[in-house]
Amino acid sequence: VLVVKRPKGINVHPIQRGGILTREAREALLEWADGYSVCDFCFEGRVDLIQKPPILEFKEEVAEFLGMDDVRFTAGARHAKFAVMNSFRGTVVLDSLAHYTSYIAAELSGLKVYEVPNSGYPEFKVDPQDYAKIFDKVREETGKYPSLALLTHVDYRYGNLNDAKRVGEICQEYGIPFLLNTAYTSGVMEVDGKKLKADFIVGSGHKSWAATAPIGILAIEQNQAAKVLRTSLTRGNWSGRAFTKKEISLFGCSPVFGLPLITLMLSFPTVLKRVKRWEEEIEKVRWFVREMEKIEGMRALGERPRRHTLVQFESPSFHLIAMKHRRKGFFLYDELKKRGIIGIHPGMTKNFKLNIYALSWDEIGKVVEAFKDIAEKYGIEVED
């Protein structure tokens, strides 16, 4: 019998903090774990139209929460991005720190990619005005403006919070549909699509909405719904079979039939409340960065002051230890695990990412003390 157990401790994994299940969601795991568990009372052939459990009502609540007109649930944020991009032809402009799945979705959809540059080391910031410059460049080179623009609200590498509203305004000025990837923002901080001028919002339930994986959220403005949510026109030439309610960009019916959707629903009341506490999370991460940078050589990359709880550090002092240690880069993971801290990628010392979202002040203090203790053990200077 194969038995796999996860390590225990304070989890600072950069892609897991916002997906930690609520008590209500965790209690439902066994009851809803079997296959297509939400489909007992499916009469319309689509998961988003099921009324028992109240998925139809829930998607309307999520649309209101995001300030958008309609919502679908998808097999992760990557599926949501593909559903949008597959409805366009030509070119897409995206930020140069976009997640790899944004590029893959574009490639699979036959879209040519143009990147908006960032400022490089050490802040890696994206200037919203550069979207206009790239739009003009695309027209100059192809004869047409881009079909679509994508902005990663908070990038997965440095945790920079980009100016979505300004990019949305620029997209409106040019008449280019705007896709906002909120995988690391919606669900942990307030996101209002109408205020941000977004035509599409993509979210990640397992990254930021306290749900099991995989589940994404696709929110759409009404003027784009017919384009992206178009239904099947196929009819079998011999059988005459047709599937007129099936939305083709969502594979007819999104594969989110059990725990992903149920946990998303059960965690939603908590999500509604926790986005109101974002300022406290920012207060925590700014204190955390100040304390971590008391370790010799430790430096947070990305924008300052910090506006998100995901942080990448460069740590040349730990890397020097790793070069001489018998465990090489794994020594840091080992030392943290001994002190009850998990989630740092094994083998990483030159740079590493972590996320302290929703940790208590006491837990954050323990993380800081663990790093300082390791530094002192190996002769790295730590400020008082």
Where are these regions (language model features)?
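PLP-dependent aminotransferase-like
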Residues: 90-146
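Active-site C-terminal subdomain of aminotransferase-like
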Residues: 205-307
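Conserved active-site segment immediately N-terminal to the catalytic lysine
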Residues: 192-206
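Conserved C-terminal alpha-helix-loop-beta "cap" of PLP-dependent enzymes
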Residues: 2, 283-380
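Short acidic loop-to-helix transition motifs that present clustered carboxylates
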Residues: 76-80, 99-100, 121-124, 183-188
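Active-site phosphate-binding strand-loop segment of PLP-dependent enzymes
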Residues: 124-182, 186-187
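Conserved N-terminal alpha-helix of the aminotransferase class I/II PLP-enzyme fold
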Residues: 14, 25-86, 97
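Hydrophobic beta-strand scaffold residues
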Residues: 113, 178-179, 300, 343
